Amino acid sequence: MYQRNILVEQTDPEVWAAIQAEDRRQEEHIELIASENYASPAVMAAQGSQLTNKYAEGYPGKRYYGGCENVDVIEQLAIDRIKQLFGAEAANVQPNSGSQANQAVLMAFLKPGDTILGMSLAEGGHLTHGMPLNMSGKWFNVVSYGLNDKEEIDYDALEAKAREHKPKLIIAGASAYALRIDFERFAKIAKEVGAIFWVDIAHYAGLVVAGEYPNPVPFADVVTSTTHKSLRGPRGGIILMKAEHEKAINSAIFPGLQGGPLEHVIAAKAVAFKEALSPEFKQYQQQVTKNAKVFAETLIQRGLRIVSGRTESHVMLVDLRAKGITGKEAEAALGKAHITINKNAIPNDPEKPMVTSGIRVGTPAITTRGFKEEETRLTANLVADVLDNPHDEANLEAVRAKVHALTSRFPVYR
């Protein structure tokens, strides 16, 4: 028998100390990694509930185990809410991650050796879209599209490659592309060559919900996403699809890839989806894009080059070559100043993937903690200050003090 008042700090002081240290890091550091955000206390409470104890192989109303009547209610709520958010015909909320959601799409529609057409990882795509070391690159014949000389998706070249290679599946979506994607044009190309059209909106999902980024659901056969990042939920994945594909996708998730779903995480997803249906969430996403625009403009004013020259979303790539430092060096220097960011390859990057010539910046997390244009401009200037003198310890100390002054005014959790 367990007593409900027994806490981690009593039973495992070592783990508790690390949790507390991470809590301090999140509160005291400015988070600019585009794929990170802060889940609400309600989302975290749902994920930490007794639902973690329940096995529930199958789907609502069709379970292998008994005693699933309560998790059925929760999972159906999550399904109904995510369908409402995106206007989707059908949805699966069981994927444990975005990568597993993507694997399910490949399993549902393809056989090993089939041809897929996805965005090159070197020009902004994601590793699950055909990177050679990923399952998607090992099992399938991969053809890649990329950017034109304006660093925008080259739709003409994409169309030509689709006609030449006749892929069975075409992928839209990226992990490091700041501009809007023309999903309607993608859909027309896919229809012309008889391909399944799949969109991965892991980065853009929250913006889509709020109307700040185009919604691919009316055009795509299937759409995948993570549930953290801009959706601000727990770590996990979802799949949206046309009703005709529901059976194939559901079978690919279970029993194809997963066994018992994580119902405590699905409960947290349901809570996050309800939050995303609120007017406040739309206002939040509007501020995310405002902050991103201000951040990019400020960095440009400070002499830095933004890939594509602008952002039309929450994210931007910064070319560091003019500063004479690598992305790896910038990440380390900014980390010392308590600004968390990630190194990132830029198009046609001459550096190795673990070094890079750029960094990726995103505004979802700083917007969650309450930053508006003024605080965002200040943050961008602090980033530029570090990049101007990345090896000057006095400079890093001065920036760190300003970071702490700012984060103390805008706590993540009060």
From Swiss-Prot:
- Fetch the CDD domains from UniProt: SHMT (cd00378)
Instruction: Give yes or no: UniProt keyword Amino-acid biosynthesis.
Output: yes
Per UniProt, (6S)-5,6,7,8-tetrahydrofolate binds at 121, 125-127
Per its UniProt record, the required cofactor names are:
pyridoxal 5'-phosphate
Named from the GO MF annotations, one term is: pyridoxal phosphate binding
Q: Which UniProt keywords apply?
A: Amino-acid biosynthesis, Cytoplasm, One-carbon metabolism, Pyridoxal phosphate, Transferase
Where is the protein situated, by its record's location annotation? Cytoplasm
Q: N6-(pyridoxal phosphate)lysine (modified residue): where?
A: 229
One GO cellular component term, please give it.
cytosol
Supply the EC number(s).
Answer: 2.1.2.1
**Marked site: Plays an important role in substrate specificity:** 228
Entry superkingdom: Bacteria
Q: Give any single GO term for biological process.
A: tetrahydrofolate interconversion
Give, as in the UniProt entry, the pathway in which the protein acts. One-carbon metabolism; tetrahydrofolate interconversion; Amino-acid biosynthesis; glycine biosynthesis; glycine from L-serine: step 1/1
Under the heading NCBIfam families, the entry gives: PRK00011.1
Function, in words? Catalyzes the reversible interconversion of serine and glycine with tetrahydrofolate (THF) serving as the one-carbon carrier. This reaction serves as the major source of one-carbon groups required for the biosynthesis of purines, thymidylate, methionine, and other important biomolecules. Also exhibits THF-independent aldolase activity toward beta-hydroxyamino acids, producing glycine and aldehydes, via a retro-aldol mechanism.
Its quaternary organisation is: Homodimer.
- Protein name, entry field: Serine hydroxymethyltransferase
Q: Organism source for this protein?
A: Acidovorax ebreus (strain TPSY) (Diaphorobacter sp. (strain TPSY))
**Encoding gene, per UniProt annotation:** glyA
